[in-house]
């Protein structure tokens, strides 16, 4: 199979998925290395396909409910042990954590899609965080970071802000 054919097949798979596909799973399915998949994804993005890279794998961005939701960027600070508490504060008010962003002194803005949409997503992310040899991005900026949060209404975004403030996470 040529690279072009493989990328076409990967794209078809991503279009039918509602959950992320890991690079390792794609590599196994197409009998190539994970690095080849990373390169394929980069080439597809260069062709204007909106492919998200999450901690659970790759997704193609579909037009969905979150697209029409109001969004707000929150500047927060907390310990690694408080990550799950932060996520739950957002999810309890119907919010979704779309990304994490840090402002690095040397590299500038570093943004990673999270797509934490449920308590199960939050638990899974936190479990991976605790068992990973890697550190969260917030370590680069003394625990300070941003999240883009989407919620069904501005009122819910206000309640999320209030809860993050109450917990001492929101920096203003």
Locate each region found by the language model.
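Residue-level marker of alpha-helix boundaries and capping positions
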Residues: 1, 14, 31, 77-78, ...
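Extreme N-terminal segment that seeds HTH/winged-HTH DNA-binding domains in transcriptional regulators
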Residues: 1-28
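Solvent-exposed alpha-helical segments within well-ordered globular domains of core cellular machineries
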Residues: 8, 12, 39-42, 127, ...
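Generic secondary-structure signature for well-ordered alpha-helical cores
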Residues: 15-19, 35, 46-49, 92, ...
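N-terminal helix-turn-helix
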Residues: 20-53
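Conserved beta-strand edge residues that scaffold enzyme active sites
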Residues: 28, 58, 104-105
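Minor-groove-contacting beta-hairpin "wing" of winged helix-turn-helix DNA-binding domains
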Residues: 51-62
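Mid-protein regulatory/catalytic core that forms ligand/cofactor-binding pockets
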Residues: 68-172
């Amino acid at each position: 199979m040529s690279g072009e054919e493989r990328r076409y097949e990967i794209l078809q798979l991503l279009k039918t998925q509602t959950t992320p596909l890991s690079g390792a799973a794609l590599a196994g399915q197409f009998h190539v290395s994970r690095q080849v998949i990373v390169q394929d994804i980069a080439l597809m993005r260069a062709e204007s396909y909106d492919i998200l890279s999450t901690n659970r794998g790759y997704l193609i961005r579909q037009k969905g409910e979150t697209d029409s939701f109001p969004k707000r960027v929150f500047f927060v600070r907390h310990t690694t042990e408080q990550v799950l508490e932060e996520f739950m504060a957002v999810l309890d008010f119907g919010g979704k954590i779309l990304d994490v962003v840090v402002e690095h002194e040397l590299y500038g803005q570093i943004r990673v899609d999270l797509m934490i949409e449920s308590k199960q997503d939050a638990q899974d992310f936190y479990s991976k965080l605790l068992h990973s040899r890697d550190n969260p991005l917030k370590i680069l900026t003394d625990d300070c970071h941003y999240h883009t949060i989407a919620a069904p209404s501005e009122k819910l975004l206000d309640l999320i802000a209030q809860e993050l403030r109450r917990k001492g996470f929101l920096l203003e």
